[in-house]
Amino acid sequence: MSSRDAMLGRIRTALGRGPLGPDEAATVNAGLTEPARNLVPDRAQGKPQDLIERFIAMATEASASVDRLSDISEAPARISAYLAGQNLPKALRRAEHSLLETPDWQACSLFSVSTGATDGNDLVGLSVALCGVAETGTLVMASGPQSPITLNFLPDTHIVVVRAGDIVGGYEDSWDRLRQHMGASRVMPRAVNFITGPSRSADIEQTLLLGAHGPRRLHILLLDDPA
């Protein structure tokens, strides 16, 4: 017996319940395999192009900046221009994601690129989102070897690539996308982060402060590439 089975067994005993009957088990399995959909707001509905435009509008409203790419090979030059515009050094730490292996990062002069998780000493981090949520302009980040969670929180500037084909309508759709990402293994990531705009807080005297608990800048590279 696994530790999970033992724990669930103790809970059943405390509740005075025995094993699930066939009907109860079928109800539980149906809820897991085909979860019921909640009411879908208007902002989470629309054709793919409508959702993309809504994602851009909502992300911008949340103080993120958005730059559209036609090909991932454009990323180094666009990032270099963005860093120059923000008066930031041309150095970043990127996730070891397969999508980020394609560009020639040395094509831009004076561009220093390191890879992997950050220890907090990097000013700029580059990640790839699992998907984007049009309803609120939110990025969904699933932790893993190709997506270190530290890049989401420690660098002062967070740059995130998201494919246009990975823009979904609402939060329920993002969980569907996560299940697809998990595949047959059904193994959940250690963490799933929903990021809407830069980090902010107004705890002190109701004065809004960007970068209070994470990056003060969020720059999104929207890749016009079907997922």
What function would you assign to each model-found segment?
Residues M1-A227:
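The feature marks the mature, well-folded catalytic cores of soluble enzymes
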